[in-house]
Design a protein with these regions (language model features):
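Skp1-binding F-box subdomain of Cullin-RING ligase substrate receptors
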Residues: 2-109, 115
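Conserved beta-strand elements of beta-rich interaction domains across eukaryotes
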Residues: 11, 22-24, 32, 119-123, ...
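Eukaryotic intrinsically disordered and solvent-exposed regulatory patches
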Residues: 11, 99-104, 152-155, 210-215, ...
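Glycine-rich phosphate-binding P-loop
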Residues: 105-142
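Active-site-adjacent loop/helix micro-motif of nuclease/hydrolase catalytic cores
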Residues: 125, 177-185, 207, 234-244, ...
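Switch I (effector-binding) loop of TRAFAC-class P-loop GTPase G-domains
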Residues: 133-183
Length: 321
């Protein structure tokens, strides 16, 4: 009966109840209860990052297959991962981080540059890039820089919060005509940015790619990466291939291993059935990336979630926003 009643309380209420006495401190840590909260709530979370990603495989296992030590991790797993709990526990920006950002602004006198790529740019009914370029009330266009990259261009500069300029270099897999044909037919367009390596004909081929020289030049000069993932649940996805391409773009021989990766888990519009961001991070094997990353839910039509993601990647790049 206690368990049934506690299941109607919020996790925050349970934590307060647990602070009243030793008895409730023990009772509210019931692993079955916190596993229930995890399975119930994580599909509704709008972002997850490299510091808060829960162990999806452990959560999905039957309780009978877990030992006692593992069982007691569920409460900590929830508090670490839940966006609401993390906002309450988030410390103030530490002094040295602010100083680092200030020094970064003195040394780097050009606007930060971000490379944006991924199937969500090409497969969705609503174009994220087109919406960004025509939504001055959300993210105004600030200009087109003169710095050119051969075969790529200069990208587009935007303004965040009316004070911080940043530049996005959008990398498409192929021509606009081929992308549109693939979108209508719900096929994957041939990706001309990547060259597959290894034995493709092997019985168990491993996905491995290298990127073409023009894109390599982009990867060497950018401060971070935005990967636009198709989060719509109604079609098949090639997540292993996507992860291999993310690895190729962020390879350590092309630049610093500290450059962050923002994954915009994107759908066309509100009401579209989406893959939860926690499952997106799990499917893309982001825990295997040796760099900061964030998965942020986003909508192309309204640009919901976009600014949150941009703020995160700029802060991770050393920009005080």
């Amino acid at each position: 009966m206690q368990f049934y009643i506690m299941s109607f309380l919020s996790p925050q209420d349970l934590c307060q109840l647990g602070s009243t006495c030793q008895y409730w401190h023990t009772v509210v840590r019931d692993p079955v209860l916190w596993r229930y909260f995890l399975l119930r709530d994580l599909p509704s979370w709008s972002f997850i990052d490299h510091n808060s990603m829960p162990d999806v495989e452990k959560i999905s296992k039957p309780l009978g297959g877990l030992d006692d030590d593992t069982m007691h991790d569920y409460m900590q797993e929830y508090l670490k991962s839940c966006p609401g709990c993390r906002r309450r526990l988030k410390p103030y920006r530490r002094g040295y981080a602010a100083v680092t950002s200030f020094l970064h602004s003195l040394v780097i006198n050009t606007e930060p540059r971000l490379a944006m790529f991924g199937p969500g740019l090409e497969q969705l009914e609503v174009s994220l890039v087109r919406k960004m370029m025509h939504s001055p009330d959300v993210i105004p266009v600030a200009g087109f820089p003169q710095r050119q990259i051969n075969g790529i261009g200069s990208g587009i500069s935007f303004m965040l919060n009316n004070k911080q300029r940043f530049n996005i270099l959008t990398l498409y897999s192929t021509t606009s005509k081929e992308r549109e044909r693939a979108r209508v037919e719900q096929n994957n367009a041939p990706n001309k940015m990547f060259l597959q390596e290894g034995d493709v004909a092997a019985e168990c081929p491993t996905m491995s790619y290298r990127i073409i020289p023009q894109v390599q030049e982009v990867c060497r000069v950018v401060d971070g990466f935005i990967y636009v993932a198709n989060a719509e649940a109604g079609r098949s996805h090639e997540r292993e291939e996507e992860f291999a391409q993310i690895q190729a773009m962020t390879a350590s021989d092309l630049g610093s291993s500290n450059r962050p990766v923002l994954v915009l888990s994107c759908v066309s519009r509100a009401g579209t059935r989406r893959i939860p961001c926690v499952y997106m991070a799990h499917e893309l094997h982001l825990n295997r990336l040796p760099r900061p990353w964030l998965v942020q839910d986003a909508e192309a039509e309204t640009l919901n979630g976009l600014l949150n993601g941009i703020e995160w990647i700029l802060e991770e790049s050393g920009i005080n926003v």
